[in-house]
């Protein structure tokens, strides 16, 4: 079978902080390599793989989109959606705009930008060329299959965490196993999963009320740990458009960099 088109992140740039790719099928952020860090000290040691697609041994990815209230019949983009892209690569000076039409009067656009370090900015738009009024809720999620090897240090948190209304909340993987679905209300803040050196974090629009969630499922053979948020619904009238901008950090926990992002984005 022929692989579906992908566009690379920072191709041919040995000095870039990250590399990887985004597949037009699903348009998830699911292939991110940290170029400046290696698994071992040896010169030829593999670079750190931050995110991996579903078909790999240890899937770990971020996804964004829209949902509607139960009972509303409308086709929304999902992991099977084949998007069109206006460019063939993603670099800091050049965002990629994706588009898809659902055949029911809605046009979906997603603009993905990346900075010089580890921050993605995802702007999702919906344009209503149809005759129906709708209420769409933006969401973002980070999904990780199976618990990684952790150091188990008492003083070092590894696992799900978030900041909600200014308060830090940390959960262990065992906490999620014991309580598979926990929700938190907040305006602003962020939610993510941390390792000793690496952090994946969703930073939604800081001015919109959100419901953050820590979520766990077990199929018997694989465990899935998920953090996600659902934002307040956005009404979409005929001939109207709605837009939401969210951010994703996927990289090394460099304190000066994290402090700068906190200053920039709240």
Each predicted region: which residue ranges?
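Soluble non-transmembrane domains of integral membrane proteins
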Residues: 1-266
